[in-house]
Swiss-Prot record:
Belongs to the PICALM/SNAP91 family. Residues 302-324, 870-882 have a biased composition (Polar residues). Thr-310 can be modified by the addition of N-acetylglucosamine which can be further phosphorylated. There is no evidence for direct Thr-310 phosphorylation. Its main location: membrane. The gene is Snap91. It is found in: Cell membrane; Membrane, Coated pit. GO terms for cellular component: AP-2 adaptor complex; presynapse. This is Clathrin coat assembly protein AP180. GO terms for molecular function: 1-phosphatidylinositol binding; clathrin heavy chain binding; molecular adaptor activity; protein kinase binding. Coiled coil: none annotated.
């Protein structure tokens, strides 16, 4: 098996003959040679993903086809090639993979061709699961965690808490799938698995950086959150600590395999006192004690603009203070009153992309009173803590109410000294709370060892190892392994576990410390608070449902797509949207801001927001909540015209919310069978304009919110009432008995502006579709025979099985029509509906929607007449269209109108 086999050459030659250079390159990259895919073939494929005329689905299909080979070498190389393209190729590639319902189905793969095949098959199964998870998380988030910006103004650091709480479990699931690869150094025995391991290693570094940013963001905002959110955040933080241990083990394997130490970050655990502080805060919230949750009366030096004593509960955080008050110390007494702005100083667990501006001012910054001491609880990984050490005497934690008794130097003081009355206390905390920092900070018992850039008087042996780690390049620099970052900025370089006493790390470079005082853009900060602070409107709902929220968050991460379903929608018009999707991207502009549904029985609907469900969760709030109907969701002209952000009245019953949120088009769902059963409630009117960019909505005037039966016929311009969905009056759920219209009703509905369709419905209603066989002069057309076979079979009782909103199964909808079921199920339709599966079929509610993804967005396929149980796949091939009569065969061509006049 050393070289290419004959079959490899034949396959490549076949594709050469057919002229498919891309498929040929895929074959060349996945030969039977036991070595990683050759760089020239990978580069060719990467270049191909950037070409506009290359068929990405065909490339992916060829890779999937190679992954069905019986040889572990070919399969493994197909996986490595796919992973390489997901990471380095154009985003169109991973976007397409995310749109597919199935990717690699290798959970049972086994190559029995030798002991090596058995061993490698195990890793193939794990690796394929990770790649599936990677595509799935892209589908849910609409971005790739490994590609997004990291650091102080990165995506995870600036994300609003509601969205953050939903994103973190998705990220945790992806990291878990990666860690399950679980390889030992002695198993990395060939070039194929080595190539896979290198890709996984690089992914893990980027994913963990994102994870770290998310945790920093959570901790910054922890003291402003409501009780339910605090519970979720604490749970996420606990999981983070356990995953850190597993990540460290993975990185040890990488080190043993010979990956450059400079590329491997050192991880240091946060002090346990941090966890205690968080738990104490949560207990205070649950105990409903107002005021200072930490029990210290002195306001934090940083929160002078709004003293802690004025705040009764974190829920009442004033929205106005976000821009003016300096970042609050995260351990401040409940002073959520001074909301933590998203300025960089407020904490860097792993400051991944440090900014180099203002370096000269940085050395003095930490000693400046409150505003300058904005590093408060500190750039948790920021190097400025070292500078702080050199300039501040170490008797700092004088008034630290939580400081333990004098302890051996190994213990760090509790970071709760936010209430310290002196600035020095604050700065000292900066040095000690380095959750993961390089800050080998001196404990209270020892003098600062050295200033930034100098050499330490005595460096213990373990520290030398850490220095070695420091001197490498920055693993998070934008380009792979680029060495542009200053050596001391390897931001994962941390305290080695062996050190008995923390010591300041001397670094070879004399670059000044990063000041970490550049504030990130104000709009982001405003958007973030808009989302957090206005959430108080639904505090009552959250209180009653926080238990449910907690269970959702604790579910397996792969399914816990949007953990806390009960966050209330922001009320500031369109403020959070630019934050979530600045470029009106077609994936998920508002998929994460859901109005609270109170006790509405839909916890699983959190599973259904998908890549394209633009506003899937902006369903109308039930009457139990205090927040108004979501008017602001229309502020952005979504690609689907905000089809699902309905402005229906608040008095709708809770089932209404269920229907509109769950049924509203998770265009890409299809993973897992755990989606909820459809309810037969009517659809809110806002869903009728599925593809109409609602201009009233865009300018802030939500269409009539008074009654949910107000329906704008102009949505179906030019189609008469033929395709108009049946709307039940005033938002009442339609009783099942009124669903199948009588033949007379269907006939009257059918008399639209389209003569052919009207006549077709008359034929169905009058039941004389068979009469033409009596006419001898029409026999040459053989019309009736065309209606009898297979997919074209048409029952005589059709009037009872299709409601007025869906054309009869024998007719072809007009080419200009919007499929009436594309956005929602037609009302209670028992038979061949588009949005709702008939009872008894295993089809999930969303199964027929994915057809819309891989095609141009404004040209949905006709799915209206789908046969019950048909599972549509997202690839836009004719085979996936619902079986119906070809346009050429007019069902009325052989009928004489005189027959039924």
């Amino acid at each position: 098996m050393s070289g290419q086999t004959l079959t490899d050459r034949i396959a490549a030659a076949q594709y050469s003959v057919t002229g498919s250079a891309v498929a040929r390159a895929v074959c060349k990259a996945t030969t039977h040679e036991v070595m990683g895919p050759k760089k020239k073939h990978l580069d060719y494929l990467i270049q191909a993903t950037n070409e506009t005329n290359v068929n990405i689905p065909q490339m992916a299909d060829t890779l999937f086809e190679r992954a069905t080979n019986s040889s572990w070498v070919v399969v493994f190389k197909a996986l490595v090639t796919t992973h390489h393209l997901m990471v380095h190729g154009n985003e169109r590639f991973i976007q397409y993979l995310a749109s597919r319902n199935t990717l690699f189905n290798l959970s049972n793969f086994l190559d029995k061709s030798g002991s090596h095949g058995y061993d490698m098959s195990t890793f193939i199964r794990r690796y394929s699961r990770y790649l599936n998870e990677k595509a799935f998380s892209y589908r849910q988030m609409a971005f790739d965690f490994a590609r997004v910006k990291k650091g102080a103004d990165g995506v995870m650091r600036t994300m609003v808490p509601e969205k953050l709480l939903k994103s973190m479990p998705i990220l945790q699931g992806q990291i878990d799938a990666l860690l399950e690869f679980d390889v030992h150094p002695n198993e990395l025995t060939n070039g194929v698995i080595n190539a896979a391991f290198m890709l996984l290693f690089k992914d893990l570094i980027k994913l963990f950086a994102c994870y770290n940013d998310g945790v920093i963001n959570l901790l910054e905002k922890f003291f402003e959150m409501k009780k339910g959110q605090c519970k979720d955040a604490l749970e996420i933080y606990k999981r983070f600590l356990t995953r850190m241990t597993r990540v460290s083990e993975f990185l040890k394997v990488a080190e043993q395999v010979g990956i450059d130490k400079g590329d491997i970050p050192d991880l240091t655990q946060a002090p346990s006192s941090l966890m205690e502080t968080l738990e104490q805060h949560l207990n205070t919230l649950e105990g409903k004690k107002p005021g200072n949750n930490e029990g210290s009366g002195a306001p934090s030096p940083l929160s002078k603009s709004s003293p802690a004593t004025t705040v009764t509960s974190p829920n009442s955080t004033p929205a106005k203070t976000i821009d003016t008050s300096p970042p609050v110390d995260i351990f401040a007494t409940a002073s959520a009153a001074a909301p933590v702005s998203s300025a960089k100083p407020s904490s860097d667990l792993l400051d991944l992309q440090p900014d180099f501006s203002g370096a000269a001012a940085g050395a003095a910054a930490p000693v400046v009173p409150p505003s300058g001491g904005a590093t408060a609880w500190g750039d948790l990984l920021g190097e400025d803590s070292l500078a702080a050490l050199s300039s501040v005497p170490c008797e700092a934690p004088i008034s630290d109410p939580f400081a333990p008794e004098p302890s051996p130097p190994t213990t760090t003081t509790e970071p709760a000294s936010a209430s310290a009355s002196t600035t020095t206390a604050v700065t000292a905390v900066t040095t000690e709370v380095d959750l993961f920092g390089d800050a080998f900070a001196a404990s209270p018992g020892e003098a600062p060892a050295a200033s930034e850039g100098a050499t330490a008087p005595a460096t213990p042996a373990p520290v030398a190892a850490a220095l070695d780690a420091c001197s490498g390049n920055d693993p998070f620099a934008p380009s792979e392994g680029s060495a542009e970052a200053a050596p001391e900025l390897d931001l994962f370089a941390m305290k080695p576990p062996e050190t008995s006493a923390p010591v300041v790390t001397p670094t070879a470079s004399t670059a000044p410390p990063v000041p970490a005082t550049a504030p990130s853009p104000a709009p982001t900060a405003v958007a973030a608070t808009a989302a957090t602070t206005t959430a108080a409107a639904a505090a009552t709902t959250t209180a009653t449902t926080s238990a449910a929220a907690a269970t959702t968050a604790a579910a397996p991460p792969a399914l816990d797509i949007f953990g806390d379903l009960f966050d209330s929608a922001p009320e500031v018009a369109a403020a959070p949207k630019p934050d979530a999707a600045p470029s009106i991207d077609l994936f998920g502009t508002d998929a994460f801001s859901s109005p609270p549904r109170g006790a509405s029985p839909v916890p699983e609907s959190s599973l259904t927001a998908d890549l394209l469900s633009v506003d899937a969760f902006a369903a109308p709030s039930p009457a139990s909540t205090a927040s108004p109907a979501k008017a602001e969701s229309s502020g952005v002209i979504d690609l689907f015209g905000d089809a699902f952000g309905s402005g229906a009245s608040e008095t709708q019953p809770a089932p209404q919310a269920v229907s509109s949120s769950s049924a509203s088009a998770d265009l890409l769902a299809g993973f897992g069978g755990s989606f909820m059963a459809p309810s037969t409630t009517p659809v809110t009117p806002a869903q009728n304009n599925l593809l109409q960019p609602s201009f009233e909505a865009a300018f802030g005037t939500t269409p009539s919110t008074s009654s949910s039966s107000s329906f704008d016929p102009s949505v179906f311009d030019g189609l008469g009432d033929l395709l108009m969905p049946t709307m039940a009056p005033s938002g009442q759920p339609a009783p099942v008995s009124m669903v199948p219209p009588s033949p007379a009703m269907a006939a009257s509905k059918g008399l639209g502006s389209d003569l052919d369709s009207s006549l077709a419905s008359l034929v169905g209603n009058l039941g004389i579709s068979g009469t033409t066989s009596k006419k001898g002069d029409l026999q040459w057309n053989a019309g009736e025979k065309k209606l009898t076979g297979g997919a074209n079979w048409q029952p005589k009782v059709t009037p009872a099985t299709w409601s007025a909103g869906v054309p009869p199964q024998g007719t072809v909808p007009p080419t200009s029509s919007v499929p009436p079921g594309a956005g929602a199920p037609s009302v209670g339709q028992p038979g061949a509906g588009f949005g709702m599966p008939p009872s008894g079929t295993g089809m999930t509610m969303m199964s027929q929607q994915p057809v819309m993804f891989a095609q141009p967005m404004m040209r949905p396929p006709f799915g209206a007449a789908a046969v019950p149980g048909t599972q549509l796949s997202p690839s836009p091939t004719p085979a996936t269209q619902s079986p119906k009569k070809p346009p050429a065969k007019d069902p009325l061509a052989d009928l004489n109108i005189k027959d039924f006049l």
